[in-house]
């Protein structure tokens, strides 16, 4: 599993069709104040154990102001699935997605990351798996780190 973790002062994700107007994007997840926006990618050999390991790492990694973790200050996380984290653009002009797990494999593992975070006591908001999403955030720093488990 691969996660791109950004320290934010607020973030939201919206999806077209999430409101009564199918063409208007509606907010499906939002965090206010200091927290983490986490983009999660899944590859073929990922397991529920790796999802739990990633959740523990996200909850305890000290990347917030003052070298604090989300668990230290009860900061929220916005978790968004993103298969493109396993894209490969080394050859040609078009990336390949061969390393990304198919949706039927990836979705339950992203859900497991979220469930494990919540079991640890985290406040978690999410995007919508497989949807065309719009992510808005205020990056604090900017501070971005990649975590692989």
Curated annotation (Swiss-Prot):
Give an example GO cellular component term for this record: cytoplasm
What's the domain of life for this entry?
Answer: Bacteria
Name the keywords, alphabetized. Answer: Cytoplasm, Hydrolase, RNA-binding, tRNA-binding
Supply the CDD domains for this chain: Dtyr_deacylase
GO MF terms here are: D-tyrosyl-tRNA(Tyr) deacylase activity; Gly-tRNA(Ala) deacylase activity; Ser(Gly)-tRNA(Ala) hydrolase activity; tRNA binding
Where the record places motif Gly-cisPro motif, important for rejection of L-amino acids is 141-142
Compartment(s) where it occurs, according to its Swiss-Prot or TrEMBL record: Cytoplasm
One GO biological-process annotation of the entry reads:
D-amino acid catabolic process
The UniProt entry, under SUPFAM superfamilies, shows: DTD-like (SSF69500)
Q: What is its EC number?
A: 3.1.1.96
Q: Which InterPro entries match?
A: Daa-tRNA_deacyls_DTD, DTD-like_sf
The domain-related comment in the record is: A Gly-cisPro motif from one monomer fits into the active site of the other monomer to allow specific chiral rejection of L-amino acids.
Q: Which family does it belong to?
A: Belongs to the DTD family.
Tell me the function of this protein.
Answer: An aminoacyl-tRNA editing enzyme that deacylates mischarged D-aminoacyl-tRNAs. Also deacylates mischarged glycyl-tRNA(Ala), protecting cells against glycine mischarging by AlaRS. Acts via tRNA-based rather than protein-based catalysis; rejects L-amino acids rather than detecting D-amino acids in the active site. By recycling D-aminoacyl-tRNA to D-amino acids and free tRNA molecules, this enzyme counteracts the toxicity associated with the formation of D-aminoacyl-tRNA entities in vivo and helps enforce protein L-homochirality.
Protein's name according to its UniProt entry:
D-aminoacyl-tRNA deacylase
Species of origin reads: Streptomyces griseus subsp. griseus (strain JCM 4626 / CBS 651.72 / NBRC 13350 / KCC S-0626 / ISP 5235)
């Amino acid at each position: 599993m691969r996660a791109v973790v950004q320290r934010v002062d607020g973030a939201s994700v919206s999806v077209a069709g999430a409101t009564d107007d199918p063409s208007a994007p509606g907010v499906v997840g939002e965090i206010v104040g200091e927290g983490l926006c986490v983009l999660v990618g899944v590859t073929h050999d990922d397991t529920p154990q790796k999802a739990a390991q990633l959740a523990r790492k996200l909850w305890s990694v000290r990347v917030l102001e003052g070298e604090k973790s989300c668990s230290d200050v009860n900061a929220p996380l916005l978790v968004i699935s993103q298969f493109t984290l396993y894209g490969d653009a080394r050859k040609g002009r078009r990336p390949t997605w061969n390393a990304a797990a198919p949706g039927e494999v990836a979705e339950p593992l992203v859900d497991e990351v979220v469930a494990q975070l919540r079991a640890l006591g985290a406040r978690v908001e999410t995007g919508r798996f497989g949807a065309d999403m719009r992510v808005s955030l205020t990056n604090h720093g900017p501070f971005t780190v990649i975590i692989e488990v």
